[in-house]
Amino acid sequence: MTKKLHIKTWGCQMNEYDSSKMADLLASTHGYQLTTIPEEADLLLLNTCSIREKAQEKVFSLLGQWKLLKEKNPQLIIGVGGCVASQEGEQLRQRAPCVDVIFGPQTLHRLPEMINHVQGTNSPVVDISFPEIEKFDRLPEPRAEGPTAFVSIMEGCNKYCTFCVVPYTRGEEVSRPSDDILFEIAQLAAQGVREVNLLGQNVNAYRGATYDGDICSFAELLRLVAAIDGIDRIRFTTSHPIEFTDDIIDVYRDTPELVSFLHLPVQSGSDRILTMMKRAHTALEYKAIIRKLRQARPDIQISSDFIVGFPGETQQDFEQTMKLVADIHFDTSYSFIYSPRPGTPAADLPDNVSEEEKKQRLHILQQRISQQAMEISRKMVGTVQRVLVEGTSRKNVMELAGRTENNRVVNFEGSPDMIGKFVDVEIVNVYASSLRGILLRTEDQMDLRTHESPQSVIARTRKENEIGVGIYQP
């Protein structure tokens, strides 16, 4: 009888990536098949996030529901991973004894052994250590699920912003070897992936070892990824302003595969608040980065993160944030009311901003950025946009949906054979969360690179010397 696995994922794209790797790993080692129905599962995994307010309460609320399932099925195994698990550790089991496995973001690759331990000894196991980059050596080969894919290139953070738990839950920055990343992306490209999104808590802090013992910078990695046959779009998230060096900006100047869209968190427009957050840059320095980016790529759109109501934030501080929003003309944002995270320095600061004031400031900020996003969308009407077709439209299965470079969903009429390919569409209408397009040309009518598999490249370029040793000759 097939064993079923249910994974509930909260949080960032890194968590989504980790959950997909857990599913692949447990399918290869234990034959688990994914199910969306918790009641069907033999193994329940919760991949948690501790960034937002009341993260712990949310976890224990769901575990209370899963406890009832375990009472009906004592053989059910319950595991909790992610950042809350890393924070809480053994204390998590004290509040929720139904949990059998507790693992951190850096130990998910040990899940098969942990499950075997629980099944063999009927006793719980906790592993929230930070074994550097070991997990990537233990995960199965990547499996494409559509024309886009996420690839983790580094983990952790060394910045220790005063509001953030990431350095404490995911550890300090560790970069994967560049060859491992390129091989994973080449495997995905051979399966039809056209767009890759490089992931990391501070992705532009990437410093990965090369095969010859040198160090590959993030800018160098971007160019190497762009050279992989079949990869026509590159995104990355999340980056930090102090790591956004000029060599990365140069890649925007000469590498068209890198999209004209960047998510670069700033958190506040007030230098005083930025100092209290330990962001290590000023608003002016942030604006200088954007100015240089727009010189290199005039059509680039910028999104960001904002925290409103940080302890001590005055009305003047907030107005400086709003000025930055207007000056940069941000496209979109992830903006939240500040909530203290246990164990962070900011949690000890006196919170003298009223809840009403926080809510009002958040509303003003979000309204302004929504207006700016709509302005940008309306300016796209009448333009021709290259769209990567991801599948059928959510609202009408008879239509297709894809994304523009600046991350907007476009719905249009087309045929199923276009899925996974690029098309050019004219934007004819704008809606709250999507655009309407008319198909102009298909990928076959474009001057794109011809897709060629790694195997065919080797077959075409392999030569042998006089003693029969294979030589690569480009």
UniProtKB/Swiss-Prot annotation:
Necessary cofactors: [4Fe-4S] cluster
Output the lineage of the source organism.
Bacteria, Pseudomonadati, Pseudomonadota, Gammaproteobacteria, Enterobacterales
Cite the TRAM domain residue spans from the record. Answer: 378-441
Name used for this protein in its record: tRNA-2-methylthio-N(6)-dimethylallyladenosine synthase
The record lists the catalysed reaction(s) as: N(6)-dimethylallyladenosine(37) in tRNA + (sulfur carrier)-SH + AH2 + 2 S-adenosyl-L-methionine = 2-methylsulfanyl-N(6)-dimethylallyladenosine(37) in tRNA + (sulfur carrier)-H + 5'-deoxyadenosine + L-methionine + A + S-adenosyl-L-homocysteine + 2 H(+)
Q: List positions binding [4Fe-4S] cluster 2.
A: C157, C161, C164
Primary location group: cytoplasm
Provide the family line.
Belongs to the methylthiotransferase family. MiaB subfamily.
Q: Which locations, inside or outside the cell, does it occupy?
A: Cytoplasm
- The entry's [4Fe-4S] cluster 1-binding residues are C12, C49, C83
Q: Which domain of life is it from?
A: Bacteria
The MTTase N-terminal domain sits at 3-120
Q: Which GO terms describe its cellular component?
A: cytosol
Query: A Gene Ontology MF term for this entry?
Result: N6-isopentenyladenosine methylthiotransferase activity
Q: How does it assemble?
A: Monomer.
Gene3D superfamilies given for it?
A: Methylthiotransferase, N-terminal domain, tm_1862 like domain
Q: Which UniProt keywords apply?
A: 4Fe-4S, Cytoplasm, Iron, Iron-sulfur, Metal-binding, S-adenosyl-L-methionine, Transferase, tRNA processing
Q: Name one Pfam family in it.
A: TRAM
Documented EC number(s): 2.8.4.3
Q: Which parts of the sequence belong to the Radical SAM core domain?
A: 143-375
Cofactor descriptive note = Binds 2 [4Fe-4S] clusters. One cluster is coordinated with 3 cysteines and an exchangeable S-adenosyl-L-methionine.
Q: What does this protein do?
A: Catalyzes the methylthiolation of N6-(dimethylallyl)adenosine (i(6)A), leading to the formation of 2-methylthio-N6-(dimethylallyl)adenosine (ms(2)i(6)A) at position 37 in tRNAs that read codons beginning with uridine.
In terms of SMART domains, this protein maps to: Elp3
